[in-house]
């Protein structure tokens, strides 16, 4: 079964063009299930599944262990360990995807996970921040430094276009059209879309790209956002910088770069943009995903009404 795990991960990477983050999560989830199956079958533990491993050793893990009962026992074990519902659901989803792949490849005659359902998750609404909080966060980077200018530009792009971190780090020079104020974005599954940027954000971007400090360290001629060594910034480094500015700004609450994406989507909706346009701008494959912002907007309106009403 281990060789099938690797074949499945290669399929996700090369055919489905899954992101490194997605592949890392699949490795974590499948390794967890593999360890359980080895203990359940009283087998000798084998090295963890890792895409970085050049030599992939087949281990003794027969497909006869992959049954409806063993998957249910695994889910029960996770629940007994008090794993979060979201973690359990994600791990079951990884096993289901693997089983479906094996059926398509005729490795398995049928899918043993087909009727198994994970725990129901409470429907959580995104928590946008206010325009004033956005402005406070924008004003935090030190513009006397080149890195501060770069980070201000990053924050402007987050709010201007509602981009994901992975989309921002992937932007190249030829993706930007300053004349029409458009950026070509490669989203999930490498699906491309054109996203407008505000003239304000475009000015910050031009200022950053022409800064002498940037041109002097540039080693990656394609990338827009560079680290201090002139190489492309990573999603992890942007997330760390975001958290640093969040601490410096004094803003409280759980705020992430994705919060800014939720925020601008909510602001677009409140200012009259229709859901289909928001869906296209955010790169949502389903309108159902975008519809959640109507609930967020109504929640905020109710809150404002209650706070402002004299009888409240």
Curated annotation (Swiss-Prot):
It comes from Chlamydia abortus (strain DSM 27085 / S26/3). GO terms for biological process: cell division; chromosome segregation; DNA transposition. HAMAP family: Recomb_XerC_XerD. One of its GO terms (molecular function) is tyrosine-based site-specific recombinase activity. It is found in: Cytoplasm. The gene is xerC. This is Tyrosine recombinase XerC. Pfam families: Phage_int_SAM_4 (PF13495), Phage_integrase (PF00589). Site-specific tyrosine recombinase, which acts by catalyzing the cutting and rejoining of the recombining DNA molecules. The XerC-XerD complex is essential to convert dimers of the bacterial chromosome into monomers to permit their segregation at cell division. It also contributes to the segregational stability of plasmids.
